[in-house]
């Protein structure tokens, strides 16, 4: 049921007829993309400043990803986890090298960030301890284990009781973290920047303090880099800005350049916790997704996109702050993961007026607009957004 009669209106009707209502009905239906531009079924174009929520680090239809996926699919599409393939091994080798730990590091592949965090949850149980510590307002996924770690009652309460012995503490509060971690704590789960809660950046030294606290108590430090990894903040892993090495890192989103793949990297003793039969994933390490991820890693390196994310992010942040718009309180984040904090809860309105103006953004909180564009976005496209932002915000609050 596609063709000339397909419009946003008809697509919305078809969606409502067959899709579960967990997302509501999307306001537009997209048909194609190229670079940082997407086109809807009505032929209207938008600058994509959300990148599939930090997924499309190379934008849409990147030739390197297309070539890698096409070549691999024409050779070997899927094998299950019963057999080894070159793309999976090569991808694990590259991720281990990028993490750069001075101890043995091992990788488990899965399909998403939630699955990567579930794997980390299970690793923590294998320490022989059961207590976990995470942050209020954190987001680690919606499967039951990752949901238990997610510090958002609105998402948790409908599904209670949740697994685990999880204590939530204030994000960025070193004293609260130290008080919560004891000799029974298996792991502390933290995001280097809390993306889903409004691009919340912790105080300087927080991650280093968390590393010290967990090391002293013999607990694992698990860093959820699902949104902050893949060069988005100006370092391949956001925690590398702090010069620390966690015990476990989870990764997904941008790793596959649009294809579903997640990874759980474990360092040192944590790398030896899983033994045959304790965990698995039918699709994890799928050679097509792994080939796509290898292509993403190589383009990030060859095109200098990690450093570029840092430079463009600073320019974008300064440009927005320089507007001096009364609805803008401040801009926070790092690299090309930014949150425009507003003086009033108009982020959802601004998401809609930005879309009307041809820009896709996201209301990560009632008063925060999240930006997570492709790392290949042109500077001129970002400049265009900055120029359009005052009118977008004015319309969001009903100003003439």
UniProtKB/Swiss-Prot annotation:
UniProt-listed Enzyme Commission number(s): 2.6.1.11
The species this protein was found in: Mycobacterium tuberculosis (strain ATCC 25618 / H37Rv)
Positions of N(2)-acetyl-L-ornithine binding: 142, 281
Cofactor(s) required, per the database record: pyridoxal 5'-phosphate
Top-rank taxon, per record: Bacteria
Cross-link Isoglutamyl lysine isopeptide (Lys-Gln) (interchain with Q-Cter in protein Pup) per UniProt, renumbered positions: 314
Sites of N6-(pyridoxal phosphate)lysine modification: 253
Predominant place of localization: cytoplasm
Subcellular location: Cytoplasm
Cofactor note as given: Binds 1 pyridoxal phosphate per subunit.
GO MF assignments: identical protein binding; N2-acetyl-L-ornithine:2-oxoglutarate 5-aminotransferase activity; pyridoxal phosphate binding
PANTHER family reported for this sequence: ACETYLORNITHINE AMINOTRANSFERASE, MITOCHONDRIAL, AMINOTRANSFERASE CLASS III
Quaternary data: Homodimer.
Gene Ontology process terms (BP): L-arginine biosynthetic process
UniProt protein name: Acetylornithine aminotransferase
UniProt pathway annotation: Amino-acid biosynthesis; L-arginine biosynthesis; N(2)-acetyl-L-ornithine from L-glutamate: step 4/4
Residues found modified as N-acetylthreonine: 2
Catalyses which reaction(s): N(2)-acetyl-L-ornithine + 2-oxoglutarate = N-acetyl-L-glutamate 5-semialdehyde + L-glutamate
GO-annotated cellular components: cytoplasm
Keyword set includes NAD: no
Recorded family membership: Belongs to the class-III pyridoxal-phosphate-dependent aminotransferase family. ArgD subfamily.
Keyword set, alphabetical order: Acetylation, Amino-acid biosynthesis, Aminotransferase, Arginine biosynthesis, Cytoplasm, Isopeptide bond, Pyridoxal phosphate, Transferase, Ubl conjugation
Signal peptide bounds: none
UniProt-annotated binding residues for pyridoxal 5'-phosphate: 113-114, 139, 224-227, 282
Extra remark: May also have succinyldiaminopimelate aminotransferase activity, thus carrying out the corresponding step in lysine biosynthesis.
């Amino acid at each position: 049921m596609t063709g000339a009669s397909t419009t946003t209106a008809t697509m919305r009707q078809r969606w409502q007829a067959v899709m579960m209502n967990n997302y509501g009905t999307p306001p537009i239906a997209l048909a194609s993309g190229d670079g940082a531009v997407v086109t809807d079924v009505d032929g209207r174009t938008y600058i994509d400043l959300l990148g599939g929520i930090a997924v499309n680090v190379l934008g849409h239809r990147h030739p390197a990803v297309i070539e890698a996926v096409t070549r691999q699919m024409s050779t070997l599409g899927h094998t299950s986890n019963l057999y080894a393939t070159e793309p999976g091994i090569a991808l694990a080798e590259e991720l281990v090298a990028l993490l750069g730990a001075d101890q043995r590091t091992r990788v488990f592949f899965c399909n998403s960030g939630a699955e990567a965090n579930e794997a980390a949850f299970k690793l923590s149980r294998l320490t022989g301890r059961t207590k976990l510590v995470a942050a209020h307002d954190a987001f680690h996924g919606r499967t039951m284990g990752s949901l238990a770690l997610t510090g958002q009652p609105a998402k948790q309460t409908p599904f209670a009781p949740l697994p685990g012995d999880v204590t939530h503490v204030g994000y960025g509060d070193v004293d609260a973290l130290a008080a919560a971690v004891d000799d029974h704590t298996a792991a502390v789960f933290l995001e280097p920047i809390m993306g889903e809660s409004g691009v919340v950046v912790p105080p300087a030294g927080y991650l280093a303090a968390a590393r010290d606290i967990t090391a002293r108590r013999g607990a694992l430090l698990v860093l959820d880099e699902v949104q902050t990894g893949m060069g988005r903040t100006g370092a391949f892993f956001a925690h590398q800005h702090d010069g620390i090495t966690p015990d476990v890192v989870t990764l997904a989103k941008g790793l596959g350049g649009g294809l579903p793949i997640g990874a759980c990297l474990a360092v040192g003793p944590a790398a030896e916790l899983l033994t045959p039969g304790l965990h698995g994933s039918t699709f994890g390490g799928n050679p097509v997704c792994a080939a796509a991820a290898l292509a993403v890693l190589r383009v990030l390196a060859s095109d200098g996109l990690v450093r570029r994310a840092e430079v463009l992010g600073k320019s974008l942040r300064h440009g927005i702050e320089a507007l001096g718009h009364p609805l803008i309180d401040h801009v926070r984040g790092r690299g090309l993961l930014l949150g425009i904090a507003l003086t009033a809860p108009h982020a959802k309105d601004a998401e809609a007026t930005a879309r009307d103006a041809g820009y896709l953004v996201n209301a990560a909180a009632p008063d925060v607009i999240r930006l997570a564009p492709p790392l290949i976005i042109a500077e001129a496209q970002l400049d265009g957004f900055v120029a359009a932002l005052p009118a977008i915000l004015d319309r969001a609050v009903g100003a003439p």
